[in-house]
């Protein structure tokens, strides 16, 4: 993988970049739609490709259980299995193990947990996490980390941070040993990211950042945010870590993805984002519009003949009214969720295009002013 910073914004850490992957060029700042189980929910892959989306996220934890890494490998890897021609970033599954799995127990070797599918006990290690993602053929592989809950005691935060560093070292060693064996393309084309932990303790975050940079990764992710902490504390962590990290490497904030949060974090120098909100909110009947979020299930939209957003050119906005989509959702028709999901993802994609355009034209400050205080729900 190669990352290029094309242009920086004066008076800000915001930057325009380009990520070169084995499956195409990804322009940054970039938002990754979440395809947890090898699909972005309620969306055809071709629709994402037609809208210029180049990078999506999948999760090794979920794929480990269903259909299984070995099954996907038999199909030729994750790209072939899911019919996706763009790039894929896979999460190691650490967050899901700690947050979703019952009977989770941590050891120096890794984390032991109970399968949500058949109840068997499994062990996820830094080595097995790397192996699984490499066998999937991921363009960007994430190291295994220990994501502590919020709030956590100082002692627990320190232990999780040290464990994350040790696991990152072991993951990097495995990566170096295995990549040429598993990848048919030149190994340098693929990349390994380290994940920075430390809760909202900025000193621990800097300590973790420094140690991961000593190990050396192709990119750096800030994990363990959006787990209940106040947004102001999240933002402070991102600001501190982003200003400390190597400027030549891509920076990724994991799981934080409200539009106004993305704008704030782009201003702090972040390049990559992911979040389940666009499709999750769609499944609950909500749509992103220029003014904020509207809840189409509300009775006031029953006879509304206007499109979801008059400034949007997506298929849902071109062809259908708010009233019709309201009807679909109330009738529990799948089409309603599909239309809202695509609309919301294209809202995000359009936002990222606007961000890149304003950065390219040296007008980032103007764009930032437009988004001030945008946290509206209707």
From Swiss-Prot:
Residue sites binding substrate per the record: 91-95, 145, 197, 224
Entry superkingdom: Bacteria
Entries under SUPFAM superfamilies matching the protein: tRNA-guanine transglycosylase (SSF51713)
Leading EC class: transferase
This protein's pathway: tRNA modification; tRNA-queuosine biosynthesis
Known catalytic reactions: 7-aminomethyl-7-carbaguanine + guanosine(34) in tRNA = 7-aminomethyl-7-carbaguanosine(34) in tRNA + guanine
Start and end residues of each stretch annotated as RNA binding: 279-283
EC number: 2.4.2.29
Keyword terms, alphabetized: Glycosyltransferase, Metal-binding, Queuosine biosynthesis, Transferase, tRNA processing, Zinc
Gene Ontology terms describing biological process: queuosine biosynthetic process; tRNA wobble guanine modification; tRNA-guanine transglycosylation
Cofactor notes: Binds 1 zinc ion per subunit.
Cross-referenced Gene3D superfamilies: Queuine tRNA-ribosyltransferase-like
Pfam families: TGT
Residues annotated as signal peptide: none
UniProt: Zn(2+) binding residues: 312, 314, 317, 343
GO MF annotations in UniProt: metal ion binding; tRNA-guanosine(34) queuine transglycosylase activity
Record-annotated active site: 91 (proton acceptor), 274 (nucleophile)
GO cellular component, one term: cytosol
Family: Belongs to the queuine tRNA-ribosyltransferase family.
Function: Catalyzes the base-exchange of a guanine (G) residue with the queuine precursor 7-aminomethyl-7-deazaguanine (PreQ1) at position 34 (anticodon wobble position) in tRNAs with GU(N) anticodons (tRNA-Asp, -Asn, -His and -Tyr). Catalysis occurs through a double-displacement mechanism. The nucleophile active site attacks the C1' of nucleotide 34 to detach the guanine base from the RNA, forming a covalent enzyme-RNA intermediate. The proton acceptor active site deprotonates the incoming PreQ1, allowing a nucleophilic attack on the C1' of the ribose to form the product.
Cited NCBIfam families: Q_tRNA_tgt, tgt_general
Subunit-level organization: Homodimer. Within each dimer, one monomer is responsible for RNA recognition and catalysis, while the other monomer binds to the replacement base PreQ1.
HAMAP family referenced in this protein's UniProt entry, alphabetically: Q_tRNA_Tgt
Protein name stated in the entry: Queuine tRNA-ribosyltransferase
UniProt source species: Methylacidiphilum infernorum (isolate V4)
């Amino acid at each position: 993988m190669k990352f290029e910073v094309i242009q920086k914004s004066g008076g800000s850490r915001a930057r325009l970049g380009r990520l070169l992957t084995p499956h195409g060029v990804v322009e940054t700042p970039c938002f990754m739609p979440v395809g947890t189980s090898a699909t972005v929910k309620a969306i055809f892959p071709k629709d994402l490709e037609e809208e210029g989306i180049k990078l999506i996220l999948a999760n090794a934890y979920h794929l480990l259980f269903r259909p299984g890494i070995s099954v996907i490998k038999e199909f030729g890897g994750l790209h072939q299995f899911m019919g996706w021609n763009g790039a894929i970033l896979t999460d190691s599954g650490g967050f899901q193990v700690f947050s979703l799995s019952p009977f989770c127990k941590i050891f120096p070797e890794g984390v032991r947990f109970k399968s949500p599918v058949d109840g068997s006990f499994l062990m996820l290690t830094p080595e097995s996490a790397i192996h699984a993602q490499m066998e999937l053929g991921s363009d960007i592989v994430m190291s295994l980390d220990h994501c502590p809950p919020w709030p956590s005691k100082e002692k627990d935060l320190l232990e999780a941070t040290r464990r994350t560093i040790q696991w990152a070292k072991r993951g990097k060693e495995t990566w170096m040993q295995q990549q040429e064996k598993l990848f048919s393309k030149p190994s340098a084309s693929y990349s390994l990211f380290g994940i920075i932990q430390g809760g909202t303790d900025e000193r621990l975050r800097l300590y973790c950042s420094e140690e991961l940079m000593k190990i050396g990764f192709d990119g750096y992710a800030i994990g363990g945010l959006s787990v209940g902490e106040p947004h102001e504390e999240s933002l402070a962590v991102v600001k501190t870590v982003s200003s400390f990290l190597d400027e030549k490497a891509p920076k990724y904030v994991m799981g934080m993805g409200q539009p106004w949060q993305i704008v704030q974090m782009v201003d702090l120098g972040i390049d990559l984002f992911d979040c389940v909100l666009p499709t999750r909110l769609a499944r609950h009947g909500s749509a992103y519009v220029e003014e904020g979020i509207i809840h189409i299930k509300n009775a006031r939209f029953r006879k509304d003949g206007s499109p979801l957003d008059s400034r949007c050119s997506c298929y849902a906005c071109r062809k259908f009214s708010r009233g019709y989509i309201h009807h679909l959702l109330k009738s529990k028709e799948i089409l309603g969720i599909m239309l809202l999901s695509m609309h919301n993802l294209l809202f995000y994609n359009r936002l990222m295009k606007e961000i890149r355009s304003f950065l390219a034209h040296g007008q980032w400050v103007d764009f930032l002013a437009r988004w001030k205080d945008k946290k509206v729900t209707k």
